[in-house]
Amino acid sequence: MEIKEEGTSEEGQHFLPAAQANDPEDIQFTSIQKIPNEPQLEFILACRDLVAPVSDRKLNTVVQISVIHPVEQTLTRYSSTEIVEGTKDPLFLTGVTFPPDYPIYEETRIKLTVYDVKDKSHDTRSFLGCASFKVGELLKSKEQLLSLSLRTSDGGKVVGTIEVSLVKMGEIEDGDTDHITTDVQGQKCALMYESTAPESLSGKENLPFMNAVLRNPVCKLYRFPTSDNKWMRIREQMSESILSFHIPKELISLHIKEDLCRNQELKELGDLSPHWDNLRKNVLSHCDQMVTMYQDILTELSKETGSSFKSSSSKGEKTLEFVPVNLHLQRMQVHSPHLKDALYDVITVGAPAAHFQGFKNGGLRKLLHRFETERRNTGYQFIYYSPENTAKAKEVLSSINQLQPLIATHADLLLTSASQRSPDSLKSSLKLLSEKTELFVHAFKDQLVRSALLALYTARPGGILKKPPSPNVSTEEKSTQHDTPQLRRQDSIPHHSDYDEEEWDRVWANVGKSLNCIIAKVDKLIERDSHNEEGAGGSSSKDGEADHTLEDSITSHPREDWYEQLHPLILTLKECMGEVVNRAKQSLTFVLLQELAYSLPQCLMLTLRRDIVFSQALAGLVCGFIIKLHTSLHDPGFLQQLHTVGLIVQYEGLLSTYSDEIGMLEDMAVGISDLRKVAFKITEATSNDVLPVLTGRREHYVVEVKLPATVFESLPLQIKEGQLLHVYPVLFNVGINEQQTLAERFGDVSLQESINQENFELVQEYYSIFMEKMPPDYISHFQEQTDLKGLLDNLHQNIQAKKRKNVEIMWLAATICRKLNGIRFTCCKSAKDRTSMSVTLEQCSILRDEHQLHKDFFIRALDCMRSRQTQGALNESDDPETGCLTDNKPTSRHFYPVALLLVSSHLLVVWLILSLALLLAKYQ
């Protein structure tokens, strides 16, 4: 129902004093003192003794809130309460809240207009009365409560009273809370709250951190009665995230860098036979086109300004493919009289999917399976490596790229410790160097590397083997290497006229030998140093003579001897490591060349689709991780769980298994699964730029999250030292719309069933790790508070039950996630209708189960949260789903559809048909 306000500019003048109306520029306006990032002003409303137009009529009242701006001197509709039926003393559960950036001052006047709604379906209502007040009057009132007379439009007859009570979220004051009843007519007016925010939400040091992530917050305020007839306050907040565009741009930049590097590595393979050289040229041509396309997309994304999210109307735009649809934070802050303030966050986002690519042939799950099946079942004219081997090659290359710089860094730290002549520091640096080097050596033990070296040898000009190599060829079978024709010497491997497989064993074994030399030298230096110290304190003459001899041997070297003696060994280690890396990279690059040569252009198109879906999923994950970290910084148990176990990330999917949404679900399943290759690292921010930084390549990414210095210092040592923090993404999907009904009756729901079963096993795996790694005292307390085992069993039973539209799966998965301190996501096609229904239902269920919401008010609370009228009648341009991405519109355009009054699809079709008929009749 749209509230229509007539003569807004005239009424604005009417309610303004003459001085303000005529000379607004000469007036100094007084800002409202507020907590940073908190709403500037919040109040709730109640009416008393309303006079009905007809004596025997029961009123159905709604209040329209409008703002008279002192500068523009115009009246702007701002929001509405819900409709309260059948009483002359309505107490409204929906309050009014003004976000931090809203231009409101003490001189701003608020107009309250009360209507009697006669027929909601036909938008029939009548004006009852109105009143107005200045914001400063409310703030400075003795009890921060105003009682205003409602008058008719001519300003004459009094038709009742409206009471305005200021709200400050926080602790409740002593008051008549025990006298609140569940009867609407008997409820008392709002009680005052002191302004106290949860510790993790206050504090100026965190503001840059959150402001770098969230934008354009829009708040809603409610008050609901508890089961013991007391009030609890609820604030809903919806925020956009700047990460919607920041993360895709970071990721595309990494893709470009990685692909350019791969192309260069292909060029540096050296001379190849004509057959392989032609294949390489073809691959490079396609890869260059791919890089150019990514560069064009990045350029277009860099031009985007204005809104921080992509609306669903833009989900098919090519330049915005990598950007998630409707990424928002939906936060519910609850203050109840008995319990500590609580926050409940859900990230809402459209299902990660390649909408521009389309779903005619299915989504990633089906396309990848078909691609790999065809590759297995087809013979080719060149050496073939299975998908497992190409994946292994990428994994080894990823390990090389991660470990080589780490080893170099630890080697330099070892030399620094040596120059400082610090035994303890030397031991610590040596331990880290040894661990990373052992991992490095172990990575090259894989048989694939040996096979790839041989395959590359055969691809050289004249390099022909008597039989083709295989990734699983044994050492005995590879004895034919000595029968190969002579190959001219090059910088690339092999360096012998005949391929010598044992040479590779010697090369990578040299890395281990170099490390052993360093370990032996460090042990010797530390031992001599300890003997020297013991000799200095010796008492016997015999010991003194021995110590004197040892002192001579030690002092014959200058004190920087440690550095000088270790430096050549470190150089040798780096040289050996460099030789191994060069050979391994070339051989494994050749494996990838074979994959690309076979699969063009399908392989690159699948890579593009996977990159698009992963980008959308990653943007949401980073947003959720940062928000979860921010709200839990003062929770030692959470921080310990973060670095000990990692975080579970639960995605609630509401896609049907019908038509295009099957492809979306297949895309989404792969995109969320790919998030397992993402790790987080927390660092100290050294500047005002606290946006997350992304590093890595397609097989492994690290997201660097920056924290202010004061916050960073309070973290556990393991996190401060840069330990990688892992996530465990899981997806549970239950289709709930009409299309799912068709799928269950006439189609196939096996995709949904298999996804739910697979991800249940992942949840069980996480639970096992959680119970194993967390401290016993924490586990003991945790088990006392939560029957997680019972929840898991119940979830498993529901998954096995194969019940139609079994939303119990969603509720159980969400509960398990919250109990495990996880990150919650809710997704449907566009994060609109189904998502909003799910989120509001979940919020009301939490209020009922965790905060004692009165059972008689559950439906009314749900209606309040779903009512579009509580934020006023939005124009088409105010709807975030119809606005242009780059338009600079008022903040109201961003209000999230969680609060919209939603209709089912068939009713929407009827409405469209009727609208078209009316238009035709009008113009005829």
From Swiss-Prot:
Task: Cite the Gene3D superfamilies for this sequence.
Answer: C2 domain
C2 domain sequence ranges = 23-148
**Single GO MF annotation:** inositol-3,4-bisphosphate 4-phosphatase activity
Task: Describe regulators of its activity.
Answer: Strongly inhibited by inositol hexakisphosphate.
Which residue ranges have biased composition labelled Basic and acidic residues? 1-13, 475-498, 542-551
> Per UniProt, which keywords does this protein have?
Hydrolase, Lipid metabolism
Annotated region (Disordered), positions in chain: 1-20, 464-498, 529-551
**What does the record list as GO biological process?**
intracellular calcium ion homeostasis; negative regulation of osteoclast differentiation; phosphatidylinositol dephosphorylation; regulation of bone remodeling; regulation of nucleocytoplasmic transport; regulation of phosphatidylinositol 3-kinase/protein kinase B signal transduction
Q: Does the record carry DNA-binding as a key word?
A: no
EC numbers listed for it are 3.1.3.66
Q: Which InterPro entries match?
A: C2_dom, C2_domain_sf, INPP4
Instruction: Tell me the Pfam families matching this sequence.
Output: C2 (PF00168)
- For the protein in the UniProt heading, the enzyme class is hydrolase
The chemistry this enzyme catalyses reads: a 1,2-diacyl-sn-glycero-3-phospho-(1D-myo-inositol-3,4-bisphosphate) + H2O = a 1,2-diacyl-sn-glycero-3-phospho-(1D-myo-inositol-3-phosphate) + phosphate; 1D-myo-inositol 1,3,4-trisphosphate + H2O = 1D-myo-inositol 1,3-bisphosphate + phosphate; 1D-myo-inositol 3,4-bisphosphate + H2O = 1D-myo-inositol 3-phosphate + phosphate
Q: In which pathway does it act?
A: Signal transduction; phosphatidylinositol signaling pathway
UniProt function note: Catalyzes the hydrolysis of the 4-position phosphate of phosphatidylinositol 3,4-bisphosphate, inositol 1,3,4-trisphosphate and inositol 3,4-bisphosphate. Plays a role in the late stages of macropinocytosis by dephosphorylating phosphatidylinositol 3,4-bisphosphate in membrane ruffles. Antagonizes the PI3K-AKT/PKB signaling pathway by dephosphorylating phosphoinositides and thereby modulating cell cycle progression and cell survival.
Similarity comment:
Belongs to the inositol 3,4-bisphosphate 4-phosphatase family.
The protein's name: Type II inositol 3,4-bisphosphate 4-phosphatase
Source organism of the structure: Mus musculus (Mouse)
